[in-house]
Amino acid sequence: MRLLGAGDIRGTAGRLGVRPTKKLGQNFVVEPGSVRQIAALAAVRPGDLVLEVGPGLGSLTLALLEAAVGAGDARLVAVEIDPVLAAELPKTIADRAPEFAGLVDVVTADALAVGEAEVGRPTVLAANLPYNVAVPVLLNLLAALPSLERGIVMVQAEVADRMCAGPGGRVYGAPSAKLAWYASARAAGTVPRSVFWPVPNVDSKLVAFARHDPPSTSASRAEVFAVVDAAFGQRRKTLRAALGGWAGSPAAAERLLRAAGVDPGARGESLPIADFARIAQARQDR
């Protein structure tokens, strides 16, 4: 399959009058080897429905389509917020891979608001996520699409580090804990700035994730995430102090923490998601 190169990307963008914007986090991948690497890491299997977010001008889309065809009985759905790019993508696919164009559905939508009604039941995510909303998009997709089993995403390097961080790590925070509710994440490689157009001012990394069951608790996800937000809202404070507002007072927070088996003198950055779930449940059980 003929993938897109730098000249193809710039030429199409010029013809369409498209100028990549920071508002939409647009940095297009222009190196075929890089998109093939991402597609390979997606490990598309027979019967998969692959979800791509932010396909842009289609460089990764074509590589994923190539992988889907190779896997057999796999399909692709691409979600693009920019209507001009969404309208152009089917034309690019028809030009480069006309015999497989029927395997791709393009949806014009905001990935922060999509669900099964728009994209069906995808099993794998592969995406160059917009840098400015990467974490919210990923968390929304995992919440809205329980069929998503695994994925590979390209994000800003420091965001990748936070996604993959574990308790006690320097960059472990609310995004790390919330992602851990849904899935395990690991670093899967680095991506040089030179493969993008325009060239970004930051480095990029690949993050692979695999869904797992959430912690066992009778508390809802929203209740657990409220504890996470409170704990990391005041990172340098002990949990007794940081959760005072959430619990009603520091003394009430201490009682709930002790009921959950968590040290009131600990800080949020030391707790795994299961501990946050126990704290939320302790409040529910009181």
PLM regions and their residue ranges:
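Catalytic cores of RNA-modifying enzymes
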Residues: M1-V227, R258, V262, E269, ...
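Short helix-coil junctions and helix-kink-helix linkers
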Residues: G244-W246
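Primarily a LysM-type cell-wall glycan-binding module
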Residues: R235
